[in-house]
């Protein structure tokens, strides 16, 4: 009798077969994400599909944390996974270990990451933007030597501002060698001393334009000292070169427009300036003519002598006043000199000298008498003080029979300072006597 298998047993057997097949344990798969969900646990659940089939898939939190982008519905992805069976539902599904964007999606991811990095470093800040010269003498054009871009730029410059010298620098704008060629030619153009540099090319896919998203190209544009207009692709195309350039043009033609003034507009401005200047000069001359006519009608201009008659008379008056003033000054000085001469004669001078001599002798005599009197008085005062000092001297006192008692080199002035058997010294006029106190008697005893 045949043995019937349970659903669980069959499911486990199928899972065992899947898990043991080496071809299913490490597969590379590409497809589109659908029904994408991120669980609160951090695990990812989604389907991978192409136009004909759908496979269930999941990615554990640990692997999901290693992703360099945020997966979303509709992303084209490349997966590294293993195939197994989810026993509870009996479905086979893939367990994804690695995931990355496929093709263009990966390029857009790299573009966004580099854009954010450069933005954070300040490469796109407005303070670094240089103004485009209004009237350029030389314009360097960096683009392919053939193609619509160079033709559009040259024809536009020729029609708008033929005075500008165009320096075409043939540059690779696509391919593996384009990046280095773009960088080299930007540095070369910067060294030429041109006024403006146009870097551009025609439109294309993101892969075609990718060289203008390279970090080294962006830095070369940023470091360039000459103003740069970026004209890469069509109006809807954007590259990192557009963000870092001083000005972004939607097309190569627009770049040429931004780099040059319009000669016809300039001619109109010049004509307007000529008209305004002519009108101003005409109005100014009319005003001056009117003023001249008004002055010419003034009565003094009809009789020119009236302009200077009064001035001549005024000059004569000033001359007379000046002459009178000088004569008056001279007479005054003569008078002062005469007075001085009268006051200053020999006789008067001799009398003055003689009188001063007499006064000097009198002062000298008075001073001498006063000095002698002061000396005499001082001598008497000194003598009296010396006599007084001698009378008060201890030596004179001892000459009269008195003595001075010393104890321990101190003068004794009272019996209260002595005791029996004290050793004392008696100072007399002709020497000292050492003695011992036998008895002390006070006056009140």
Swiss-Prot record:
Its EC number is 3.1.11.6. It is found in: Cytoplasm. CDD domains: ExoVII_LU_OBF. One of its GO terms (cellular component) is cytoplasm. Transmembrane segments: none annotated. Pfam families: Exonuc_VII_L, tRNA_anti_2. NCBIfam families: xseA (TIGR00237). This is Exodeoxyribonuclease 7 large subunit.
């Amino acid at each position: 009798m045949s043995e019937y298998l349970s659903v669980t047993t069959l499911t486990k057997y199928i899972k065992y077969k899947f898990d043991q097949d080496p071809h299913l344990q490490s597969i590379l798969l590409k497809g589109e994400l659908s029904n994408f969900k991120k669980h609160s646990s951090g695990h990812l659940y989604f389907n991978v599909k192409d136009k004909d089939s759908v496979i269930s898939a999941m990615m554990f939190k640990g692997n999901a944390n290693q992703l360099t982008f945020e997966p979303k519905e509709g992303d084209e992805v490349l997966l590294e996974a293993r195939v197994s069976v989810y026993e509870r539902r009996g479905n086979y599904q893939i367990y994804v270990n690695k995931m990355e964007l496929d093709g263009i999606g990966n390029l857009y991811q790299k573009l966004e990451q580099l854009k954010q990095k450069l933005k954070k470093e300040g490469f796109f800040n407005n303070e670094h933007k240089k103004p485009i010269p209004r009237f350029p003498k030389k314009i360097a054009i960096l683009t392919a030597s053939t193609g619509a871009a160079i033709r559009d730029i040259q024809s536009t410059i020729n029609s708008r501002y033929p005075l500008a010298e165009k320096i075409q620098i043939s540059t690779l704008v696509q391919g593996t060698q384009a990046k280095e060629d773009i960088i080299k030619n930007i540095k070369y153009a910067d060294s030429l001393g041109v006024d403006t540099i146009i870097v551009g090319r025609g439109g294309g896919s993101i892969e075609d334009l990718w060289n203008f998203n390279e970090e080294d190209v962006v830095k070369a544009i940023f470091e360039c000292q000459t103003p740069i207009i970026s004209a890469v692709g069509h109006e809807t195309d954007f590259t990192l070169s557009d963000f870092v350039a001083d000005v972004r043009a939607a097309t190569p033609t627009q770049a040429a427009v931004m780099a040059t003034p319009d000669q016809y507009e300039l001619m109109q401005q010049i004509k307007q300036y000529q008209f305004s200047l002519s009108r101003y000069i005409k109005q100014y001359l009319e005003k001056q003519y009117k003023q001249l006519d008004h002055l010419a009608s003034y009565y003094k201009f009809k009789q020119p002598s009236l302009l200077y008659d009064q001035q001549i008379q005024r000059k004569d008056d000033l001359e007379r006043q000046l002459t009178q003033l000088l004569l008056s000054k001279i007479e005054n000085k003569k008078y002062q000199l005469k007075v001085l001469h009268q006051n200053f004669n020999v006789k008067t001078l001799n009398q003055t000298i003689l009188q001063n001599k007499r006064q000097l002798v009198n002062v000298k005599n008075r001073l001498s008498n006063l000095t002698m009197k002061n000396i005499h008085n001082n001598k008497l005062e000194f003598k009296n003080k010396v006599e007084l000092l001698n009378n008060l001297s201890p030596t004179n006192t001892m000459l009269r029979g008195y003595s001075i008692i010393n104890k321990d080199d101190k003068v004794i002035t009272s019996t209260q300072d002595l005791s029996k058997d004290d050793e004392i010294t008696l100072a007399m006029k002709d020497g000292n006597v050492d003695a011992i106190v036998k008895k002390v008697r006070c006056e009140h005893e």
